[in-house]
Amino acid sequence: MPRSDNLYEIPNNVPVPVADGACNHLTGMRLPSVALRSTSGRLVDLAGLSGRVVIYCYPRTGRPDVDPPQGWNEIPGARGCTPQACAFRDHHQELQELGAQVFGLSAQDTDYQREAVARLHLPFELLSDSELELANRLRLPIFEIGGMRLIKRLTLIARGGQIEKVFYPVFPPDKNANVMSYLLCRPPDVLRRSRQRNDQYLKGNEWP
């Protein structure tokens, strides 16, 4: 039976999450070493990844045949996980060109996440923190509904296992312009050196 609303759209009247300071402690922290199961079938330890990593945390993706939990749309920041995933999908190539790996992370189990990856054609892996081990060690903001404990929506940018930027709260959920702008202003070293060489070349070959 199809759900009674459009999973792929964000209603106009959803409440806006407030900046409550719940993530103020994260910038500069080291990611803890936690083996997270991926939708690709492997274990991923975010702390051990080199380079820049974008980790977008989300409460839970819905399904087209199941209505959301009662009261879901009334929770600030809860609605919009599917549009958020699609936005990262649509900008994935650009993020890769900026030197970033992308992962989605939620408290849902891997089988549930795999359905979303297949249905939404996501080109990146989703990671399951079903025991909230990573969330608890980082003291990420959590909320409860229908017997579920879920991670609030936020985005972490890490480099070499250390958190360098936090976006929280994230609203609207499908707008990742802040992430793109941040990465564009801080290109990876290889792109930075290339730009510097281009600038030097142009200075040495100016029109008379």
Regions from the PLM with identified roles:
Residues M1-P208:
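Chalcogenol-based redox active-site neighborhoods
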